[in-house]
């Protein structure tokens, strides 16, 4: 909605805060459309508390070359938000958020501190890991298993129990995301691309979009 544009390359991060409204579009690069191939990425939505929902929209972009990264004992962690092994992200998330992209060699271990006030999860998208905490595991859209010290494999999501750290052991070369954030304890209404606190706010967002005032 501001006429800005940019390119995201492998490992780059774009943190968009929609705030009071922004019109945006993400699509494959024209060269990729011509040559074809495979790519993957993650689009993760963070629900801001009511006090921040109408803040000014903004983008924070961090190229891969500037992304805080730490490597230690077979573990490589890229800190998109939050902190890992003493290294912190520079992204302003407004509320406490942890988002870490981790790669582990087979047999390596990681202990990640998580604020006990946050809800945490791990999504594995390569290899397998053992999480030495009590967790519930989403193996497919309609099934959860519950237990401790479970093997989590490619495509599975582990919801973490209460505690202030996660103990992870990689049983193969693995790649996953560690995510955590606060429980807002606020009402939530969602419709289409809009996430607000009340139906009235959703209705107003649609009116603003139709009137051309959403991103003004």
Where are these regions (language model features)?
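Jelly-roll (double-stranded beta-helix
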Residues: 1-216
